[in-house]
Amino acid sequence: MPNMSSGDDKNFDLEERTAVFGEKVIDFAKAVPRNEVTKPLISQIVRSGTSVGANYGEADDAISSKDFRNKLATCKKEARETKHWCRMIVRAAPEMRELAKPIWQDAKELHLIFSAILRKTSPPK
């Protein structure tokens, strides 16, 4: 689905970015050679990579600031987990290294974005 953002809505931009990230993860997973080692890794990276956008959508519709932070924390965890599965896939299929780099980089950037949002929205201690 194309980006339907007017360009002014930053939340929608992150929603679109997380959706595109999930699409990239799916495309990457489809390119990984299938064998007994990579099959479970592929399933894991698809789960974590597509979960980022789904959980961000949930955060965007949160009913409270606590709910928002909890959903964003899940986004952060799933982005970090996607980096892990990316690394494991490259270990199992070294020929995937170049295709994995942008996925790993996007996951790292999303992890940092969610970390920053969580820091800014956490109540003072």
Name each model feature, range by range.
Residues M1-K125:
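Short, C-terminally biased terminal segments at protein or domain edges
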